[in-house]
Design a protein with these regions (language model features):
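Conserved catalytic-core motifs of GNAT/GCN5-like acyltransferases
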Residues: 120-124, 131, 135, 140-156
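Basic/polar N-terminal segments that are highly enriched at the extreme N-terminus
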Residues: 1-2
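Short amphipathic helical patch at the helix-1/turn junction of helix-turn-helix
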Residues: 90, 124-125
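Short, surface-exposed alpha-helical segments at coil->helix boundaries
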Residues: 48, 128-131
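Conserved G/P- and acidic residue-centered "switch" motifs that form tight phosphate/ATP-binding loops
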Residues: 98
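Residues forming the Rossmann-fold NAD(P)(H) cofactor-binding site
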Residues: 101
Length: 163
């Protein structure tokens, strides 16, 4: 069964995206941040208000469904010469089943179709399986991209693939 991608535009989908983001961020980042810091990061970066503001600033959020099951989400924004992939998260039981690969390939096709020469993303530097996922698909490490959110440092790495 192939997944369906639903564009997040209505309030109910914004809240569904925020709820799923909170669930997945807590699952992915619990080994790197204490619970309180993680709550702060989720609220600052993936709350319903933040997602709505992102959408108002031309970020495209999609919910990923397999049949009637909500299994993940991703978000991207077109920039001058690149599609910037902001988020790509799947529930644990759906990882390793080529779904992330297919989402990434769709983003790359879209970027090519829009005349963009590359896809870029920032990955949490300590998430080695995620780094490996992108490297295995031809992405190269550009540079560290440390940022501070609500006083909490986030060690990110910028990756890029030329199309």
């Amino acid at each position: 069964m192939k997944p369906d991608y639903k564009l997040v535009a209505k309030a109910k989908y914004i809240h569904a995206a925020a709820d799923l983001a909170s669930e997945l961020w807590h699952e992915v980042y619990k080994r790197y941040y204490p619970a309180k810091q993680l709550d702060t990061l989720v609220d600052a970066l993936q709350s319903a208000d933040v997602i709505e503001e992102d959408i108002d600033n031309d970020v495209n959020y999609f919910l990923v469904f397999l049949g009637d099951k909500l299994i993940g989400y991703f978000a991207w924004k077109m920039e001058n010469t690149a599609l910037h992939l902001l988020h790509l998260y799947l529930r644990p039981e759906y990882r390793g089943k080529a779904l992330g690969r297919d989402i990434l390939a769709s983003c790359e096709r879209l970027a090519r179709g829009e005349g963009r020469g590359r896809v870029s993303c920032e990955v949490y530097a300590k998430c080695l399986p995620v780094m490996q996922f992108f490297k295995a698909r031809g992405y190269r490490v550009l540079a560290p991209a440390e940022t501070v959110v609500e006083g909490i440092p986030m060690q990110l790495t910028t990756l890029e693939k030329m199309l």
